[in-house]
């Protein structure tokens, strides 16, 4: 993580189901140290870090003897909280971004407003219930938890795709790329809050 960055935060969250520790640096270079016990999910979070350039450390222990649900959802909660904490008042950020991202057979669009208002629009249809041992429905559960706790409006639209691994990966990469743009410091706004309300607290 960069020595100059002040947009850093750490969150620890423990329940009877999971124990999560997350650290982020919004002005990083996409370094990651991620261990959740869920291999496919680790791979997706690595994509999120690498392509957003947010340095991430995620250590999660959960009740995987039951299933992956609590671990994935609670990681989304903690990661969202860490990003919200690192953003503070959200001064000087670009705020908005959208893009379509191609990955082989798949095209996925993501749009974000780092507004302080939490909302998820999800237009994705996986054609199988699992990718390996990972439940595909947990991709939505992660982004629902992430958006609600980061305080962002997030729209995710998979336009087409035949391979479910590619669909999932394109979602994480597309979200990463719009976060990279929206969380950047805008040199023309400096310390201004990018809202006519004067606040991005929701």
Swiss-Prot record:
This is Imidazoleglycerol-phosphate dehydratase. It catalyses: D-erythro-1-(imidazol-4-yl)glycerol 3-phosphate = 3-(imidazol-4-yl)-2-oxopropyl phosphate + H2O. InterPro entries: IGPD_sf, ImidazoleglycerolP_deHydtase, ImidazoleglycerP_deHydtase_CS, Ribosomal_Su5_D2-typ_SF. It is found in: Cytoplasm. HAMAP family: HisB. Pathway: Amino-acid biosynthesis; L-histidine biosynthesis; L-histidine from 5-phospho-alpha-D-ribose 1-diphosphate: step 6/9. The gene is hisB. GO terms for biological process: L-histidine biosynthetic process.
């Amino acid at each position: 993580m960069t020595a100059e960055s002040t947009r850093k935060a750490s969150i620890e969250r423990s329940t009877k189901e999971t124990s999560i520790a997350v650290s982020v640096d919004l002005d990083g270079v996409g370094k990651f140290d991620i261990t959740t016990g869920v291999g496919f999910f680790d791979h997706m979070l690595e994509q999120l870090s690498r392509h957003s350039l947010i340095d991430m450390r995620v250590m999660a222990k959960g009740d995987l003897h039951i299933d992956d649900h609590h671990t994935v959802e609670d990681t989304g909660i903690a990661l969202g909280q860490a990003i919200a904490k690192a953003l503070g008042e959200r001064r000087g950020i670009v705020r908005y971004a959208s893009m379509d991202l191609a990955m082989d057979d798949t095209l996925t669009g993501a749009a974000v407003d780092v507004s302080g208002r939490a909302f998820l629009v999800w237009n994705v249809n996986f054609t199988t219930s699992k990718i390996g041992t990972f439940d595909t429905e947990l991709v939505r559960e992660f982004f629902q938890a992430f958006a609600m706790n980061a305080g962002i409006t997030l729209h995710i639209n998979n336009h087409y795709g035949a391979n479910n691994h590619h669909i999932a990966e394109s979602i994480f990469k597309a979200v990463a790329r719009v976060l990279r743009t929206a969380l950047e410091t805008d040199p023309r706004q400096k310390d201004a809050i990018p809202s006519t309300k004067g606040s991005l607290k929701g």
